[in-house]
């Protein structure tokens, strides 16, 4: 697995962790020595240290000196053989929990075993494929379904290689054939195709109707971060408490930027994301946008002009042929210990990889958690997500609408997004086909989810979606065109469907972490630090800088293992972990890294709490 260049999100995570550590050390250094982090292990603040530390001047990790590593490796095998028996308990058999098990099997640490407890009868967590039958392509991915081949996703694709799952192309963009319907109008070329501007009877100012106002607001911060991360980070932190909506409304921190009215902001949100997602942190929106600053470009010589030009490198998107569950199925087969399913955990003094909503229902009193960690578990915002798949007698979107290259349809109707599968485009015009008819997030998902649960309500849900599909795919917006399309879609529908709401799922209690204003800068470091004297690690996408992605769950698993091994001083295993699995950028190892301080953070906080009491 290659080591990617440090991402912008990685730099952000490192800075937040360093700032939190510096603040805590400065708070405590006048009161007591700090245990459990440096070398020797009776404290790392030695005489002669400066009176105050800063994010870029933290106590060093002396183990990373050549002399100390050499001495540690010389005796590592003998010491590890003499270690007392220990067990790692992994709560949750999603991709993070299974990944931890795979790594522990590879490390082969003497006298260390593990067990995996899963409350659900199904293994995989938020990687979940629903099969309507055993027929080829008679499925859809309820959870993770598409993976961009970009540098920050290297660990995910490395896992694909290790598990040998079959990949195929995923078509994110299906071209002009994929319909868009907003304000009861199908897309047409022009400045205001949906007639929401004041000139066309709407409420959005004419000069703003076709602008990317969110992208324009993000741009100066992104450019500042690229030019000089330290200066850019300071500027971004000044607006960390703003939601995207509030930032656009008031014109930034000082009110000197462009201010937008309610209708302009609403229209921008409708076009760019799901209902109410502009309520997430502005800083989070800025950093998230870096993930999709692709395609990249490369320089080539234009044969016509013989001049150097920049050529776009399109991003490859992949999906797993047969469904994403093949990944977690393969991982489960590779690990040495069986997953214990239907094991409901009521109290915790071990390592959870479960979602925070589920963790919050467990009795955590024995852990003596920092109050702010308890607050993070309770209050960190999770987004909702609902998917509805319908099965049809034939792929009418291909046969009747010419949508034969995947992609998505977008609308302000309740279904919001329709996803045309990439895996069944060549299955023939007469075979049954599954369509991801509705994919919603945030408030759109909450409202769609309100129709889940009873036969009558789900009958209404399916009817709404069938009618929405007809309106979106009709050749025009006349009633006659709609009726004709509705008859076609309704006749093609087999009567078979599947619906899933992640916020209604008792094993997840939400789809993925989506930090609100100020939450990432304040809560992320706390979620990433070990607790309970280094024995408790919160693992999963919520405790990663790349939350809401599979790679975030994988990164958090490696980060937790590294800090566990560092705390136990298992030097040989640490080096093997670095060589075989790489360490995510937010851990920051090396003599000037922060991993040793993250391990010691909980001990500092415990002493501070006792003094304050």
What do these predicted regions represent?
Residues 124, 160, 248, 331, ...:
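Generic structural signal for small/hydrophobic residues in well-ordered secondary structure
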Residues 351-372, 386-389:
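Flavin (primarily FAD) binding-site architecture
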Residues 223-348, 352, 359-360, 385:
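Active-site/ligand-binding neighborhood in enzyme catalytic cores
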Residues 77-223:
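N-terminal glycine-rich phosphate/pyrophosphate-binding loop and immediately adjacent elements
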Residues 3-24, 161-162, 169-284:
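Mobile amphipathic helical/loop "lid" adjacent to a hydrophobic cofactor/ligand pocket
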Residues 3-72, 362, 400-613:
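Conserved flavin/dinucleotide-binding core of flavoenzymes
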Residues 4-19, 23-39, 125-155, 174, ...:
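Glycine-rich active-site loop/strand segments that organize a redox cofactor
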Residues 371-399:
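Central beta-strand plus flanking loop segment that forms part of the substrate or channel wall
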């Amino acid at each position: 697995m290659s080591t990617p260049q440090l991402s912008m999100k990685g730099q952000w995570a490192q800075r937040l962790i360093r700032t939190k550590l510096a603040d805590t050390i400065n708070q405590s250094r006048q009161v007591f020595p700090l245990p459990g982090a440096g070398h020797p292990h009776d404290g790392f603040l030695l005489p002669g240290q400066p009176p105050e530390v800063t994010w870029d001047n933290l106590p060093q990790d002396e183990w990373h000196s050549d002399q100390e590593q050499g001495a540690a490796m010389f005796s590592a095998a003998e010491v590890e053989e003499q270690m007392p028996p220990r067990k790692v308990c992994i709560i949750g058999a999603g991709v993070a929990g299974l990944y931890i098990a795979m790594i522990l099997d590879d490390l082969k640490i003497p006298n260390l075993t593990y067990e995996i407890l899963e409350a659900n009868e199904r293994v995989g967590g938020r990687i979940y494929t629903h099969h309507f039958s055993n027929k080829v392509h008679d499925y859809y991915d309820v959870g993770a379904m598409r993976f961009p081949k970009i540098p920050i996703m290297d660990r995910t694709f490395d896992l694909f290689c290790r598990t040998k799952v079959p990949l195929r192309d995923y078509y994110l963009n299906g071209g002009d054939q994929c319909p868009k319907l907003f304000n009861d109008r199908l897309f047409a070329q022009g400045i205001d195709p949906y007639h929401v501007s004041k000139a066309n009877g709407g409420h959005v100012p004419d000069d703003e109707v076709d602008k990317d106002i969110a992208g324009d607001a993000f741009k100066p911060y992104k450019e500042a971060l690229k030019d000089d991360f330290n200066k850019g980070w300071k500027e971004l932190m000044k607006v960390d408490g703003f939601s995207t909506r509030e930032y656009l409304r008031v014109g930034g921190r000082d009110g000197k930027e462009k201010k937008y009215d309610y209708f302009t902001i609403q229209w921008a949100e409708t076009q760019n994301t799901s209902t109410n997602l502009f309520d997430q942190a502005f800083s989070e929106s800025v950093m998230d946008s870096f993930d999709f600053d692709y395609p990249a470009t490369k320089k080539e010589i234009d044969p016509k002009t013989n001049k150097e030009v920049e050529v776009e490198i399109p991003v490859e998107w992949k999906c797993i042929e047969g469904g994403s569950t093949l990944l977690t199925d393969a991982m489960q087969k590779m690990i040495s210990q069986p997953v214990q399913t239907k094991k409901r955990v009521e109290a915790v003094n071990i390592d959870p990889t479960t979602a925070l909503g589920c963790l919050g229902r467990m009795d955590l009193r024995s852990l003596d958690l920092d109050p702010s960690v308890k607050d993070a578990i309770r209050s960190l915002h999770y987004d909702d997500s609902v998917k509805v798949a319908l099965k049809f007698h034939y792929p009418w979107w291909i046969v009747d609408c010419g949508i034969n290259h995947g992609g998505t349809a977008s609308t302000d109707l309740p279904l919001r997004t329709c996803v045309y599968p990439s895996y069944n485009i060549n299955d023939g015009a007469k075979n049954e086909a599954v369509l991801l008819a509705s994919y919603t997030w945030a408030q759109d998902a909450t409202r769609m989810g309100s129709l889940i649960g009873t036969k009558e309500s789900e009958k209404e849900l399916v009817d709404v979606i069938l009618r929405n599909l007809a309106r979106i795919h009709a050749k025009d917006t006349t009633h006659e065109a709609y009726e004709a399309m509705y008859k076609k879609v309704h006749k093609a529908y087999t009567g078979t469907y599947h619906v899933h709401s992640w916020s209604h799922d008792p094993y997840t209690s939400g789809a993925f972490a989506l930090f609100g204003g100020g939450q990432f800068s304040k809560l992320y470091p706390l979620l990433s630090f070990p607790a309970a004297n280094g024995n408790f690690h919160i693992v999963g996408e919520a405790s990663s800088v790349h939350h809401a992605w599979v790679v975030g769950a994988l990164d958090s698993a490696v980060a937790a293992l590294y800090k566990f091994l560092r705390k136990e001083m298992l030097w040989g295993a640490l080096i093997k972990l670095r060589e075989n699995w790489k360490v995510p950028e937010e851990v920051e190892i090396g003599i000037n890294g922060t991993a040793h301080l993250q391990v010691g953070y909980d001990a500092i906080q415990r002493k501070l709490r006792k003094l304050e009491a």
